[in-house]
Amino acid sequence: MTGPTRYLSSRDRAAFTPVHAVWEITLACDLKCHHCGSRAGKRRPDELTTEECLDLVRQLARMGTREITLIGGEAYLRRDWLEIIREIREQGMDCTMQSGGLNLTDERIKAAADAGLQALGISIDGLRDVHDRLRGVKGSFDAAFKALDAIKRHGLSSTVNTQITALVIPQLRELMNLFIEAGAKSWQVQLTVAMGRAADNPELLLQPYELLELMPLLAELYEEGADRGFLLQPGNNIGYYGPYESVWRGNGDDRVYWTSCNAGQNTLGIEADGTIKGCPSLSTSKYAGGNIRDLSFEEIWWTTDELNINRGRTSEELWGFCGSCYYADVCKAGCTWTTSVLFGRAGNNPYCHHRALELSKQGLRERITQVEQAPGTPFDHGRFELILENADGTPRAKLPLANNLIQISSPRRKTKRTSARKELVLCRGCYRHVMPGTKICPFCQGNIRALANRYAKNLREAKKAYQRLVELLPPHIETFQ
């Protein structure tokens, strides 16, 4: 592999190799986060033993897993966490970890590095007041940055994760500057989702129309970060198909774009009691495929319906706006986790930039409102209603939770539905993706071929100009390649 081990090859995709596992090794946690989907705090009553954990590591290795990310709760609160790290590395897999950092001491970080841990991510969800409020412990912000400093000193790669709530949007630029100063190399952002304690605090959730503010800001920060050697990475529930998809999805490779939820295709989640899911964030009640105490990992991966939810998924399963969307056959409604916890079923995703843009063009927007509380168990969710209203917030029409097809003047896709992957083309006029064979862009009305030719010509001229500059400069002046 020339890139990070979790990067997928065409062979990985075709073979459904479980490349990346995210493993909650304990539910015990020293924070009290208001947006925690798993409601972490106390350990699960029947967490895997050390030997069961080590055996699962070996099973994952045999199935072709290349990276395991340890999470909690807090992974370091499990007494044998270092032993698990060592076994992962001995089995030839990469080992990374995500933490809130509250009690991630210098000694713990050094021990993890000595055991073979390669990268350590710290979750920081706002500036000091916002972060400490969300994390439920005063001083957690300072502890997180202290951990970042120790990670750097011990030679581990450091990353930061941020849950985007309604509170943090105005703070994102300042946060990025702080992360860069702290030595972090990358920053993953994802939308806070209505699961667990976040479902108890719906005021933290973004409204779908707020993507119109968020997405341009993230695009600006991506470009600013890239200029400073810092990578902003959108999580899998940040999207989809607006004018910025080509900017960040492929980390600079504009041929890369969202191609549907990967849960159970090349990723999986493991709960501390041995429950296996296609994604660590999916609700246990609906998406648990089985437990390694009852079945081998290989059996769970290949034979359970819950792990196969996305392998043969077609656009026939979509509904609402997503059911008639231009990108339905490719996108398949984005993140399964985000949609299933809102409405109790996947397939209609209001957190979509393309969707927000299309509605905005008609003076409309969508808003969610909670109609059913979450029961209070790990990875639980309530139920939300989707309301279509005028862009100024005045009433327009109320959508029921089923059969709420939104008819808009969005460009229509072909009527034939298929699960085969389409290779989309990037319009060089508006930088939105279009279907192969499209002659006139349905979004900007530009001529796709003419725009591509003009772009290629400009690129050739820019390269020639750069080469002339290199030839004219004195030899002692450095140039950037």
Language model segments and positions:
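Conserved alpha-helical substructure of the radical SAM core
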Residues: 1-119
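Short cysteine-rich clusters marking metal-coordination/redox-active sites
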Residues: 33, 322, 427, 441-444
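Cysteine-rich micro-motifs
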Residues: 348-353, 437-446
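Radical SAM enzyme [4Fe-4S]-AdoMet core and its adjacent flexible, acidic
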Residues: 1-2, 114-118, 123-125, 130-262, ...
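Short Cys/His-rich micro-motifs in 6-15 aa windows
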Residues: 445-455
